[in-house]
Amino acid sequence: MEPLSKAKQKWIRSLQLKKNRDLESLFVVEGEKSVLEGLSVFAVHLEMLVSLETFVEQIPHQFHTVTFTVTAKELEQISELKTPNKCLAVFRRPETALLTDRFTIVLDGIQDPGNMGTILRLADWFGVKQLVCSKDTVDCYNPKVIQSSMGAIYRIPVHYTDLVTYLEQTPQPKFAAMLNGKPYKEVVYPENGILIMGNEGKGVRPEILDLTDIPVTIPRFGEAESLNVATATAILLAEMIQ
């Protein structure tokens, strides 16, 4: 182990920008729990670790060769968190193939990192093996997404693509969440279905709805105007995956 150089500090800070994460195919994870989980299930993709000296003893010995130490002030300067934890890790992004004929969540223009992270966590809970997203959906490697995914980012592959082309090319049955669809409990769902969730304010785009087999809705019994997209995703997944 050695102290983290100024150059490496600057480099880690640069990964706060999506364009730099994309360019280097890397992402940053912060916080003791998330980092240690990554070392357990994602170690093959580890690029480097940064730790306070007081936390080093909790890092497994085999990772010490790629561990750099920092002061609390230095960690604060390279951290995205308002209150930095004791360590962070830089991981390489895995290369994963797009799965066919498997249940898939499609996200059309989701913008809020918290929603994206929660949907990743839901996918992990319900055993969904991938997310497919429009190119304008929030970056899954956004630090706030990673924090709210609670480790799901390590297990759920996320693909960004042109959704019209993707949906045109897959024969899987497609179900889009919307306000004026068929009540979701009246629908029979196949094991290989696609659940399409739309933008928080605008919903699913018309060109995507045109490629949908059945629009589904969660009936409203109260006065709320709409449901949070992550909440709606949870309700629909609980029905679709039995």
Segments the model singles out, each with a brief description of its role:
Residues 67-92:
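Glycine/small-residue-rich loop that forms an oxyanion/phosphate-binding "nest" at active or ligand-binding sites
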Residues 176-224:
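Active-site/ligand-binding-proximal alpha/beta "capping" segment
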Residues 1-54, 137-138:
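Boundary-proximal intrinsically disordered activation/regulatory segments immediately upstream
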Residues 1-2, 68-71, 156-164:
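Short acidic-hydrophobic, aromatic-tinged amphipathic segments that line or gate anion-handling sites
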Residues 62-73, 102, 172-174, 188-194, ...:
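Active-site regions of enzymes building and remodeling cell-envelope glycoconjugates
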Residues 124-126, 137-154, 206-242:
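Structured adenosyl-cofactor binding patch, chiefly the S-adenosyl-L-methionine
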Residues 95-181:
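RNA substrate-binding interface of SAM-dependent RNA methyltransferases
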Residues 33-35, 55-56, 74, 137-138, ...:
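Alpha-helix capping/helix-boundary segments
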